[in-house]
Every structure is written in C-alpha cells, then in structure tokens.
Amino acid sequence: MKRKTLMAITLATVTAIAPASAAFAEEATEAATEAATEAATEAATEAATEAATEAATEAAEDSTEAATEAAAEGETEAAAEVADGDVAPIEGADVAHKSSEAAPDWQAYNNLIAQIKTTTDMAEREAMMHQAEDMLMETGAIVPLYYYNDIYLQKENVTGIYCNNYGFKYFQFADAGDATTLRLNLASEPDKLDPALNSTVDGACLAVNSFDGLCTYDENGEIAMDFAESYEASEDGLSYTFTLRDGLKWSDGTDLNANDFVYSWNRAASAETGADYAYMFDPIARKDDGTLDVTASEDGKTLTINLVSPCAYFLDLCAFPAFYAVPQASVEAADGWQDNPGAWCQEAGFVSSGAYTLESWTHNESMVYVKNPNYYRADEVKIERLEFMLSADDTAIYAAYNAGDLDFADTVPTDEIQSLLDNPEFHIIDNLGTYYVAFNVNSNLFAGKTPEQASAMRRGLSLLIDRDYIVENIGQTGQQLANTFVPAGMADGNGGEFRQNDDAYTYPDADAVGYYDPSYEAYDDNLAQAIELLKEAGYEFVDDGNGNEVLSDATPIDITYITNDGSAHVAVAEAMQQDFAAIGANLTIETNEWNVFLNERKAGNFDMSRNGWLADFNDPINMLEMWTTDSGNNDVQFGR
C-alpha cells in the first residue's frame, strides 16, 4: 500500500506492532505523501489497466540474467522454464505489450506470478518468488532506498491507539481521560474513502476506523475476528466458511449480513469498478459466469469462499480494507455511480459500518468523524469525535501540536527530529515495507536504447545514490538501508525470513544479502560500477581535469523526477540530484500536491518518481504481484 509520509512512528502509550526489521516512514501529513505505506497508496484515477486481448505469448527469452543464472543452478524447474522462454501462458495471466522498444518483455513475469499463486509446493513457491524479484530488480526500474519505519507525536494522556506492521492506525478504542474528542492529523486531503478504491495508507487508516471486515487486527498485531464471530477452513485449505455475528447493522440502522460481502467483493474485483487492488481477489475461485465463488447462506448468516489454491494469508486479506463490505443501496443511489464507482462517498454523511461515521468534511481543511451508535462494539468506544486537520505542511502541523491543538500528529519536520528523539511523546515503530524510487520503462529517457541498455542505465543510476546519507541526514530514525524490494523481516511462507541466503537461494551480492551493497563503505566501488554500467548503456565519459570521470557533452543525461510536496520527499530528491550531478547528470525535480502527483504517476507521466510500498500482508507475493501488467499499482508501466 502506498505511503504518504517519509519518516517514522512509535507509540509510547500506543501499542506498536513491529516486524523483524523496518525502515523509514514517509511524512504522514503531506498533501502528498504515500506508500502504506510509506505509503503506502493510489488514489490515482484509473485503476487496473485491463489485460489486453491478444493471447498471451512467448515468454521472454533472457527474461533476466538472474533468471538464467537461477535456472542454471537448478534452483527451480519453473525458474529455468521462465528463463528459457518455455513457460506456457497461464490462463488468466496478464498479457503484456511493449509500447517502447527499450521496455522489458514482461509476459514471462506475468506468467510466473500466476504460477506462484496456484502452486501448492511451498518450497517451489519460495524459489519462484526469488526468481520474480530477480526479474524485477534486473530491470533496474525499481530502486529501493530504505526499509520503512514510522514516526509520530502523541500526547501522553492519550492511550489505546494502536498500529500494525502495515501502517494502519486504530483510534476506535482510544482513551483520553475526561476528553471525548481526539484532534488528529494523518495527512492532507484523502484521495478516496471507498475501501475498495483506496490504495493509500492514510486512506486505509480512515477506512479501518469507519468500516469493518470479517477480520481485523488486535492491539498485539494478531488477526482477530471482527464481523465474523468464527470461521472454519477445509482440510485442504481450499474452502472457508465464516459465521457472522448476530445483529450487525449499517450506520443507518439497516441490517448487514453475508450478502453484503458477496456484493462488495464482486464489486471490488470487477474490471468495471477499476479498483487498484482488484488483483488481490485472485486467490478466490471463479464461477462459470466469472463472478467470485463466494456464497451467502439463505439467512445471510454464513459466507462460504472457495479458493484456487491454499492461501496462507487469506485471513489477512479478510482484514484488508478492499475486502470490507460497502452498502449496495448507497453505492447505487449515487448520481453517476456506474461511471464513478466512488461517487457515493465523496461527501460527508455516507453510510458506513465501523466505529465512526463522517459527519462533516471541509475539503482540504478538516474532517469530523462521530461515534456510530449502531457499531456492534459501540459500548467500547470512548471517544465521541475524531477531528482531523487536513494538511501537508509539517511545520504548521508541528506548531499546532505544540500549541495543544492536536493530540496526534503523523509527521514531524525533518529539522526537528534530532531534538525529539528523547521526548516521550515522540514514537518510532517498525513497518513492513520499502521506500523506493521508480523509473517509467516507457519514458523517452530510454529512447533509442535496447532493453539491456535501458536496464544498465537504470541500474547504474541506482548505484549513484548515497542511501546512507538519506537515512542519516533526512530520515534520522535508524531506517535500514535497502538493497532488495521485498523488505527485511518479511516471512517466506516456510517458517523463515525471505531476505536471507540459504541452500536454495543466494542473493547476487551474498555478503550484503541483496542485489548490491548500499553501505557508505561501498560507495566508491558503487560509483565505479555505475560508470561502467552507464558506458554499457551507450554513454561516453571524459576526465573533468581532476581525475574524475564525468559525462561527455555528446551524451548528456537529463531526468525529470516527480514527487509530492512533503519536505522529506523533496529532501530525498535533492540528495539524489547532488548524487547524479557528481557525474554530470541532471535531475530536475517537479513537486505537486498529493492527488495531482498520484494521477501523474499512475498515468506514466514521468521519467523517475518517488514511491513507497507498505506491505498489505506478510508474504512476498504482495510486493511482487503489484508489478503485473494489469495491476492498478504498476506505476512503472511494465508490459504496457
């Protein structure tokens, strides 16, 4: 999930649920900001690009050098088949097209992800996920900088707020003593409030406090039953039956039952809705008519789901906002709902199901949520009002917090972090996700290059970035330098951690346990390697008179970098600008407010862009499936 903020968060009085390792969170309140994480994301306009209609094709020869090597080592038969171009197209897999001669052929990746989602051999599945990350990183289009953590400020009298590893913040069971109102800042104007259409972390935080699903996360970060009181899974793991609680209501007092989930899940998964997260419903089998194999009992008390293959993270999906129920009557009563599926919740007063309902919304200024008396746990909700300040100005947010006008602030100005490290109201918690920058593979930046040259160019530019400087001087809260896209701490599905060397898989840089060494000590070696890769890409270098190699005037590099206007994101861009200037490459920075930035990035109107992804659940497939051709989160335009 896309993060909106760049820094970090911890609760002193808040229960923090931390993964094995972390990274640095984005600035929570920017009018832009990502990312869930982090993130981080997207409210951008059109979601999933529909798979093109041609029959899926030859898998890419040479899909990646890493793929070939993996196959040669015999890591998995599937890996070998992908590398050799022998994988038959998978039914339902995305169909990739190359709109740029410099873009990688992406059908082999689409097919591999489809195989990962259907295999029942967990060891083979893990090997194929490593193969997929190899293919992804070989393109050079994804440039990890650090693994997320999160920072925030919270008044000492406030307790009961808790967070999970994925950036969600739960306010419904907060306690502020005699106070019944919490004044909060998460971010600027939210892009979408429809749980099915949201793809940003700040939007998810609003969703988890105003809607509910079959499952949720408790204060310990564990899956707990929510609207479902219990569930049963079949012995083969292919069927789940949930029994819903009695007396569930929408906020308008109408009944809520299993039929609402049948409607909502099919809506979220349909191409007509255009949800960025439609692909997350892929584990669910389809009926002959193409709808999800999800059935409500006649009395609406039970919901039965049949899966394509066993899915170890299925309960996590049931706790994810895209899987929440939405009120069909309200959705379809909105003017223009067929062309604008989110029209029903673009103003205050819409029907919801969680602890709070949106009472008022002054766009770009404030939102007020009030307690929902029809919430099934209403007697446990002590805070009557949540008043959100909508702003991306971290200086103004920090001033409001210090003036006593905010109880919770999800961002801190970069230049204030050092002074807050010992403040009990300042919290740093781990997230499970990666802050990264991305290249548009169809950008004119790569015009006239082969896919191999474009890859070398991107990988060379990546090695120019001083990640240590970014973390030490901008993040400042102990973020871990990133050299993989799948973050440190993510499980492998077999009881271990994915990011490690073992008998079955070794990373290209075995010592650094990743695809390169991001440390300060490796910078000189990385610079030399970057220049060699850029030469492979066709760039010429000359001596600058001081013994340094710089780009020749005959082969300049001019890149446009887009970011939202949060101060930390801009600071990261400026740091990279200086890194690129060391060899004479020019990076022009364009900043926009959050929603404009999201739309530009989703539309592919960029050379290079800031990005961030907080995991939606603890499995590498979440970091990998987002890059298939028709994924609504495929911002780099693979296969398009």
What are the language-model segments listed below?
Residues 144, 152-153, 166, 185-235, ...:
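N-terminal lobe/hinge region of extracytoplasmic solute-binding protein
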Residues 172, 236, 306-325, 345-396, ...:
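Aromatic-rich, solvent-exposed beta-strand/loop patch
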